[in-house]
């Protein structure tokens, strides 16, 4: 009988894309793979093309602020634990891999109740609330950054691995990317990535600065679902998409500079591709500040140019783009020195070890 694994994680693309990299590896090796996510989260849409069983369970939001909805969330989480536990009793996987996000906690507890080993992964400098709550119930947690170790008591559960990267991102074709946008090689390209849900402040700033940007660059703009601007269709040197999936590798390959939020998974991929970049982290007023931590760390290394979201204006962005282009060679060398590579093989080995289908590693 083939070994089996259940993946969980969702809420944003950052809690799903590393799972996709791992899912493809396990399927290649003949494992039975299933996914547990929230009923209406982005993970269902992203996992669907992989053609694996998807199970939706109830989940709370794990908010850090007061809301009347917080009163209902404990009941949603308990229901999610019950649903997950029943699913695991039926599926009986050898191991569970959790990428975090609010759906992950009830799934992790459901696995623990069924005595199924759990491996979790944390992408950010400091762990999210779901992974903090899940930590007592996991066998191992893989961290992207060594700085995250201080937030956990049981150091024997921790492995610093990096982040899994979708293999296809590393095989992009520049000319295909240019053709997809109707561009040519006469001007460098800027790739603007606002995240899976889009970013209103980035979208507005790019569009207000479009005339100046397109005088020197060709602009590829991933603006988020439902956030295309019909008035800009056909503007020379500007191509907008709601979201890019299979074509993302080619769009990256076509780009000289990337403008992005500072989510750890996106940032790790940008670094692995060796792209000079500008980071615009989500404000701490609407997040736990993890993106600000990520951005500051790489800004301190002289690698990332950072603009705070509340200071984002057309003139500030244009100056940042000029700064990156002026220091491009220096930034290229600093990124190369990091030797960033995909953690897929490392994490696959840890998962197999916990599932007892591989001889324990010597670490």
Swiss-Prot record:
Family: Belongs to the glycosyltransferase 28 family. MurG subfamily.
Gene designation: murG
Primary location class: membrane
Top EC group: transferase
Protein name per Swiss-Prot or TrEMBL: UDP-N-acetylglucosamine--N-acetylmuramyl-(pentapeptide) pyrophosphoryl-undecaprenol N-acetylglucosamine transferase
Stated role: Cell wall formation. Catalyzes the transfer of a GlcNAc subunit on undecaprenyl-pyrophosphoryl-MurNAc-pentapeptide (lipid intermediate I) to form undecaprenyl-pyrophosphoryl-MurNAc-(pentapeptide)GlcNAc (lipid intermediate II).
Gene Ontology MF: a single term: undecaprenyldiphospho-muramoylpentapeptide beta-N-acetylglucosaminyltransferase activity
Location of the protein in the cell: Cell inner membrane
The keyword Secreted is annotated on this UniProt entry: no
Keyword NAD part of the UniProt annotation: no
Entry membrane topology: Peripheral membrane protein
One Gene Ontology biological process: cell division
InterPro entries reported for this sequence: GlcNAc_MurG, Glyco_trans_28_C, GlycoTrans_28_N
HAMAP family cross-referenced by the UniProt entry: MurG (MF_00033)
Pathway(s) of this molecule: Cell wall biogenesis; peptidoglycan biosynthesis
EC code(s) of this entry: 2.4.1.227
GO cellular component terms, A-Z: plasma membrane
Enzymatic reactions: di-trans,octa-cis-undecaprenyl diphospho-N-acetyl-alpha-D-muramoyl-L-alanyl-D-glutamyl-meso-2,6-diaminopimeloyl-D-alanyl-D-alanine + UDP-N-acetyl-alpha-D-glucosamine = di-trans,octa-cis-undecaprenyl diphospho-[N-acetyl-alpha-D-glucosaminyl-(1->4)]-N-acetyl-alpha-D-muramoyl-L-alanyl-D-glutamyl-meso-2,6-diaminopimeloyl-D-alanyl-D-alanine + UDP + H(+)
């Amino acid at each position: 009988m083939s070994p089996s694994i259940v993946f969980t994680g969702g809420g944003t693309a950052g809690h799903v894309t590393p799972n996709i990299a791992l899912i493809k590896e396990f399927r290649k090796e003949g494992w039975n793979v299933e996914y547990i996510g929230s009923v209406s989260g982005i993970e269902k849409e992203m996992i669907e093309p992989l053609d694996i069983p998807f199970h939706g369970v109830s989940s709370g939001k794990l908010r850090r602020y007061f809301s009347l909805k917080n009163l209902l969330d404990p009941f949603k989480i308990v229901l999610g634990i019950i649903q997950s536990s029943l699913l695991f009793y039926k599926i009986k996987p050898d191991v569970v891999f959790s990428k975090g996000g609010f759906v992950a906690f009830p799934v992790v507890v459901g696995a623990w109740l069924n005595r199924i080993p759990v491996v979790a992964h944390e992408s950010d400098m400091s762990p999210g609330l779901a992974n903090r709550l899940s930590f007592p119930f996991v066998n191992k947690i893989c961290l992207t950054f060594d700085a995250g170790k201080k937030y956990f008591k049981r150091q024997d559960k921790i492995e610093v691995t990096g982040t899994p990267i979708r293999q296809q991102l590393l095989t992009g074709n520049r000319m295909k990317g240019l053709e997809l946008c109707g561009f040519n090689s006469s001007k460098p390209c800027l790739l603007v990535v606002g995240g899976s849900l889009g970013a209103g402040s980035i979208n507005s700033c790019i569009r207000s600065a479009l005339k100046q940007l397109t005088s020197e660059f060709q602009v590829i703009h991933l603006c988020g679902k439902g956030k295309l601007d019909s008035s800009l269709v056909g503007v020379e040197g500007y191509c907008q998409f709601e979201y890019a999936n299979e074509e993302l590798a080619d769009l990256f390959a076509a780009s000289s500079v990337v403008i992005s939020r500072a989510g750890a998974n996106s940032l790790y991929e940008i670094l692995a591709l060796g792209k000079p970049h500008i980071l615009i982290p989500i404000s701490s007023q609407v997040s736990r500040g993890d993106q600000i931590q990520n951005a500051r760390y790489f800004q301190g290394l002289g690698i990332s140019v950072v603009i705070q979201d509340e200071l984002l204006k057309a003139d500030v962005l244009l100056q940042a783009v000029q700064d990156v282009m002026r220091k491009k060679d220096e930034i290229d060398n600093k990124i190369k020195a990091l030797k960033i590579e995909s953690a897929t093989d490392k994490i696959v080995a840890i998962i197999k070890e916990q599932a007892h289908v591989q001889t324990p590693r010597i670490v």
